[in-house]
């Protein structure tokens, strides 16, 4: 069911954002579109939107229970959630607990190396530039955020990692790395935004020792491993076992 909403405000690779009568809130629809390599690889995956929406809702609520401020208000339907309206900061914030992916391609660090403390990486959110890796000095040069706001972002991101790592470990998942986005309300409040799902997290199954079978995230799509939705469904099943009843806005 499509809920009542106002005009489309923004459409990204995985979500659409619609206006609401309450100007401080918006509706987010999670799509079935799958993309990789800056949208060079595309596909439609049935049920992806529902699974990512439902996983994100539960993880946002988990984080709020640990005093992490998020934009999440509640579910509206299987693929829709209501969130607080924010201006997204054009930074992709990545926390890495285990070396893999681009970190291993760009450095001599061996695949699977544990990173303690977690590596905090920043990427400029710009498709035309390929979302380049930034230093903190470049963030300041670009004027993306001030130093104190960047410090607050890092503090929140590390807090999210501290909460999610043991949560996932309890359901036999290892949080390898993940991407976060943050936004600012009209009143200047910093909130965790976007989503937290197998699209944005690398999750390895502790119940499997096979290097491909253990992957339960978007890397299955990136690497043509198959079983993408089965993997997302398994993540949802385990998350739901700990967080069964997310709130809704109906």
Swiss-Prot record:
Enzyme class: ligase
Pfam family, one: SAICAR_synt
Bridged cysteine pairs (disulfide): none
GO molecular-function term, one example from the UniProt record: ATP binding
Keyword Ligase: yes
Reactions this protein catalyses: 5-amino-1-(5-phospho-D-ribosyl)imidazole-4-carboxylate + L-aspartate + ATP = (2S)-2-[5-amino-1-(5-phospho-beta-D-ribosyl)imidazole-4-carboxamido]succinate + ADP + phosphate + 2 H(+)
EC number(s) from the headed UniProt entry: 6.3.2.6
InterPro entries named among the record's database cross-references: SAICAR_synt/ADE2_N, SAICAR_synt_PurC, SAICAR_synth, SAICAR_synthetase, SAICAR_synthetase_CS
Family matches, as PROSITE patterns: SAICAR_SYNTHETASE_1, SAICAR_SYNTHETASE_2
Annotated keywords: ATP-binding, Ligase, Nucleotide-binding, Purine biosynthesis
Source taxon at top rank: Bacteria
Gene Ontology biological process: 'de novo' IMP biosynthetic process; cobalamin biosynthetic process
Matching Gene3D superfamilies: ATP-grasp fold, B domain, Phosphorylase Kinase, domain 1
Protein's pathway: Purine metabolism; IMP biosynthesis via de novo pathway; 5-amino-1-(5-phospho-D-ribosyl)imidazole-4-carboxamide from 5-amino-1-(5-phospho-D-ribosyl)imidazole-4-carboxylate: step 1/2
Similarity remark: Belongs to the SAICAR synthetase family.
NCBIfam families listed in its UniProt record: purC
PANTHER family referenced in this protein's UniProt entry, alphabetically: MULTIFUNCTIONAL PROTEIN ADE2 (PTHR43599), SI:DKEY-6E2.2 (PTHR43599:SF3)
Protein name: Phosphoribosylaminoimidazole-succinocarboxamide synthase
Gene name of this polypeptide: purC
